[in-house]
Amino acid sequence: MSRYTGSIFRKSRRLGFSILETGKEFAKGKQRRYAPGLHGLRRSKPSDYGVHLREKQKVRFMYGLSEKQFRNTYRKATKKTGIAGTLFLQALESRLDNSVYRAGFAETRRQARQLVNHGHFLVNNKKVDIPSFQLKQGDIFELTTRKDGKIRKNQQILTSLETRTPAAWLEVDKDNFKVVFNRMPERSELNQEIKESLIVEFYSK
């Protein structure tokens, strides 16, 4: 299954979950927390499989991954010792594109992924254009200075850095467009609407 590139607002409505994590999709006068269409309010009780599938889809769409990417990330993460669900969420959070988003360089994960794809970031002084690149404790990523640092003057990036609050596990130097990945996030610091145990059960069947 390919990565979803359609309307985030519509998908959030269908899932009853804010993919943007801001609730913006359900702001007054915009969208409602039920599926789009004439019969959006009529929801039959989902099966046990349906409940697990919906939870997986919520998180997959939130991070913007294809099914293959999502499943592979889960399998790699859960080979480590620890709580499977937490390890999985930490693996998703430590992706370079997600960290670019969490640091405040972009308003959405889609925008962050595009910045990485276009080669605008260095990790430990080396160009990395792979969104799925896994950051480790102590890694440093920053906006490139190539082409006379043109990307550092991008107004959209500057506005995002100014208005968004970076994640607690990232040390952001806004003046130098540089970020230190200090540590893995604690589960309590991540989205509390996610029931990762259902995803673990889904992939364990």
Swiss-Prot record:
Domain S4 RNA-binding: 94-154
Signal peptide stretch: none
GO BP field: ribosomal small subunit biogenesis; translation
InterPro entries: Ribosomal_uS4, Ribosomal_uS4_bac-type, Ribosomal_uS4_CS, Ribosomal_uS4_N, S4_RNA-bd, S4_RNA-bd_sf
Gene Ontology CC terms: small ribosomal subunit
UniProt entry keywords in alphabetical sequence: Ribonucleoprotein, Ribosomal protein, RNA-binding, rRNA-binding
Entry annotated with the keyword Protein biosynthesis: no
PANTHER family, sorted: 30S 40S RIBOSOMAL PROTEIN, SMALL RIBOSOMAL SUBUNIT PROTEIN US4M
HAMAP family named in the record: Ribosomal_uS4_B
NCBIfam families tied to this protein: PRK05327.1 (NF003717), rpsD_bact (TIGR01017)
Quaternary data: Part of the 30S ribosomal subunit. Contacts protein S5. The interaction surface between S4 and S5 is involved in control of translational fidelity.
Record-stated family: Belongs to the universal ribosomal protein uS4 family.
Identification of the protein by name: Small ribosomal subunit protein uS4
